[in-house]
Amino acid sequence: MELYLDTANVAEVERLARIFPIAGVTTNPSIIAASKESIWEVLPRLQKAIGDEGILFAQTMSRDAQGMVEEAKRLRDAIPGIVVKIPVTSEGLAAIKILKKEGITTLGTAVYSAAQGLLAALAGAKYVAPYVNRVDAQGGDGIRTVQELQTLLEMHAPESMVLAASFKTPRQALDCLLAGCESITLPLDVAQQMLNTPAVESAIEKFEHDWNAAFGTTHL
């Protein structure tokens, strides 16, 4: 199982990388734009924050296959080992096929159906990212989409893996993992929600109170 943070906030990546067993960081054009930093400046900083073994993802902006391929090569040249995110459109599928032959690892993104995700995997994408909450918002079932896609990949494209995205709650993320999803990427607020459990703090305070009452200290 691989856990990623979905952000371009370098300071938060540095903070949470010390706590979470993260495999890397995912970004998209909206996330990069929100950072107000040039992609060519923020990507190296993110890579440094996650270390050489961390996996970094960045997305192309072009709408045609050739443009996607050219941008993917620029990203690869800037950050060796980067995974390039390609929207799963007709042109995106063509680009994924070309990039597979070029040896550039891709993730098929903006996936709203299991069929769409399977096509990305068959085209050569190593990762496929279904948008869980966005599927729900359109009246679909995001978790079921993940389940169906996971089953399809196991049967027909075992070299590819689901990297589920678009979460609003920790429950959605856990349900994805229970559905057999192999990797997820969490926005900062959802990652933080996993840590912020009031009952835990209350339990710790009770331990400290009892220990201090007995021994006059809160240390061993």
Curated annotation (Swiss-Prot):
Cell cycle among keywords: no
Catalysed reactions, semicolon-separated: beta-D-fructose 6-phosphate = dihydroxyacetone + D-glyceraldehyde 3-phosphate
pH dependence per the UniProt record: Optimum pH is 8.5 for the retroaldol activity on F6P.
GO cellular component: cytoplasm
UniProt-listed InterPro entries: Aldolase_TIM, F6P_aldolase, TAL/FSA, Transaldolase_3B/F6P_aldolase, Transaldolase_AS, TSA/FSA_arc/bac
GO biological process: fructose metabolic process; ketone catabolic process
Enzyme active site: K85 (schiff-base intermediate with substrate)
Top-level taxonomic group: Bacteria
Keyword flag Cytoplasm: yes
Record-level Gene Ontology MF annotations: fructose 6-phosphate aldolase activity
Thermal dependence of activity, per record: Is not thermally stable at temperatures higher than 60 degrees Celsius. Is less thermostable than the isozyme FsaA.
Protein EC: 4.1.2.-
Keywords: Carbohydrate metabolism, Cytoplasm, Lyase, Schiff base
Localization in the cell: Cytoplasm
Any Pfam family hit: TAL_FSA
Cystines in this chain: none
SUPFAM superfamilies: Aldolase
Function field: Catalyzes the reversible formation of fructose 6-phosphate from dihydroxyacetone and D-glyceraldehyde 3-phosphate via an aldolization reaction. Can utilize hydroxyacetone as an alternative donor substrate. Is also able to catalyze the direct self-aldol addition of glycolaldehyde. Is less catalytically efficient than the isozyme FsaA. Does not display transaldolase activity.
HAMAP family per UniProt: F6P_aldolase
Family of the protein in this entry: Belongs to the transaldolase family. Type 3A subfamily.
PANTHER family: FRUCTOSE-6-PHOSPHATE ALDOLASE 1-RELATED (PTHR10683:SF40), TRANSALDOLASE (PTHR10683)
Description of how the protein assembles with itself and partners: Homodecamer.
Protein name: Fructose-6-phosphate aldolase 2
Organism ancestry: Bacteria, Pseudomonadati, Pseudomonadota, Gammaproteobacteria, Enterobacterales
